[in-house]
UniProtKB/Swiss-Prot annotation:
The keyword Ribonucleoprotein applies. This is Large ribosomal subunit protein uL29. Keywords: Ribonucleoprotein, Ribosomal protein. One of its GO terms (cellular component) is cytosolic large ribosomal subunit. It comes from Maricaulis maris (strain MCS10) (Caulobacter maris). GO terms for biological process: translation. One of its GO terms (molecular function) is structural constituent of ribosome. The keyword Ribonucleoprotein applies. It comes from the Bacteria. Belongs to the universal ribosomal protein uL29 family.
Amino acid sequence: MKPVDVRAMTEDQLKDSLLKLKEEQFKLRFQQASGQMENTARYGQIRRDIARIQTVQTERNSQEEQGS
């Protein structure tokens, strides 16, 4: 997921994407613990996507606070 795509999302879309990514991260963590994980790079991709979404949410919240 590219930062441009994340910034284009609405707040609801960000929340939905964040929830889906966290669920996938949870599943991958179990696969890794049981030794069934096939694509180890996917875990890092998910972690970075979660960070991107949280960064955009924080930026928007700080902009709202400054605007108030």
